[in-house]
Each structure stands twice: as C-alpha cells, then as structure tokens.
Amino acid sequence: MAAGSRTSLLLAFALLCLPWLQEAGAVQTVPLSRLFKEAMLQAHRAHQLAIDTYQEFISSWGMEAYITKEQKYSFLHDSQTSFCFSDSIPTSSNMEETQQKSNLELLHISLLLIESRLEPVRFLRSTFTNNLVYDTSDSDDYHLLKDLEEGIQMLMGRLEDGSHLTGQTLKQTYSKFDTNSHNHDALLKNYGLLHCFRKDMDKVETFLRMVQCRSVEGSCGF
C-alpha cells in the first residue's frame, strides 16, 4: 500500500475513534465521588420503583388476602417455583458475607441483576389496569435501569485493578410480566416477579452503597 493511502486510512480511523476517545477521557476526569453519587441516585430510584410497583400490585389485587402465608412462603422460597434468578448467583446471605466480597465482585453482581431486568421492565406498566399512580412510562423505567447499567460499568472501569472476574454469568433473563391479570397463574407469576424485582433492587442499592463507602468515604456505617 502506498504511503499516502496508508496515511489517509490511519487519519480516517483516528477521526472515527476520536469521539469515543474523548468520551472515555471525559469519564476518567469525572471525580469518582460524582460517579458514585449518580449511580446511587439511580439505584435508589430503581429500588423505590420496585417497592412502589410491588405495593400497588398487592393493593390493586388484594394479594395479601388472595394468597395464604403458607402459599406465599412456598412460592417465594421453593426453588421449583421461585422466579428469583438472583438466587442462583453466588452472592451473600448476610451483611458479614457481603463485606467479605471485593468491590468488583459486588459491582459485577449488581450489573448482572440489572441486565436480567432490562427486557421485562419494558412491559412493567402493562401489568396494571390503573397507571395513574405513576408519572413514568415503560420507556422511562427501561432507561432508568439502562442508565444504572452504564453507571455501574463506568465504576467497574474506574476501579479495575488488573484482575479479571471469572465465574458465573447470568445469561438467563426474567420473563415478561403476564397481562392476563384475571388468570390465577398469571397473578402468582406477576407477584413472584415483582417480589424478586424488589429484592434484587434492594441488593443493588446495598452493594453500591458498600462499594461507595469503601472507595470514597473510607469508612462504612453498616
């Protein structure tokens, strides 16, 4: 290849990559404390979304009276019926075990939980017959989790210590919510999915808070 052609190709490649390089450089200049602040804000909003959605579903369909305590326990804790894929992730069962995990491990688990929710959350609102409680749409819910996913990825990039995480990846994703709300099985399915959504987002917010206090604040009040 002629020298002039090679130079032209290199110049074209550099111009194509320039926006990405500028963006990557910009991320590196953002204070770590600010990245954590934004991620924690998104995580709190996602957790609150999960709580509000679960509570409205319970209230709208009278699920507390609809399902006995025995049925609820069996449905949520029986591995044959549980909808919580996060139960298959090698995570911690208590705060002491959580504190023993590295920052990257906690961020990695949080990322898996978020990614497992991206597709089904698109159809979250269609589960309900009354959306007046909410001022957000399916699209807003999706972009909330998408922003949180990107924020966690940025944090992982900034905290990368040269080690490579190996182990389980959560290739499974949660199924869509069932809009056939008058069907008994559909009600149970949606109940389980929303319970797990609340449980998973609580984990994400807790894990991010722990990584934040280790990385930025220097002390943890857990």
UniProtKB/Swiss-Prot annotation:
Q: Which GO terms describe its cellular component?
A: extracellular space; vesicle
Question: Which SUPFAM superfamilies does this entry report, sorted A to Z?
Answer: 4-helical cytokines (SSF47266)
Q: Does the keyword NAD apply?
A: no
Q: Does the keyword Secreted apply?
A: yes
Instruction: Please list the GO biological process terms of this entry.
Output: animal organ development; growth hormone receptor signaling pathway; positive regulation of receptor signaling pathway via JAK-STAT; response to nutrient levels
Q: Which UniProt keywords apply?
A: Disulfide bond, Hormone, Metal-binding, Secreted, Signal, Zinc
Q: Which residues form a coiled coil?
A: none
Binding residues annotated for Zn(2+), in chain numbering? 44, 205
Family that this chain belongs to: Belongs to the somatotropin/prolactin family.
The entry's protein name is Chorionic somatomammotropin hormone-like 1
Species in which this protein is naturally found: Homo sapiens
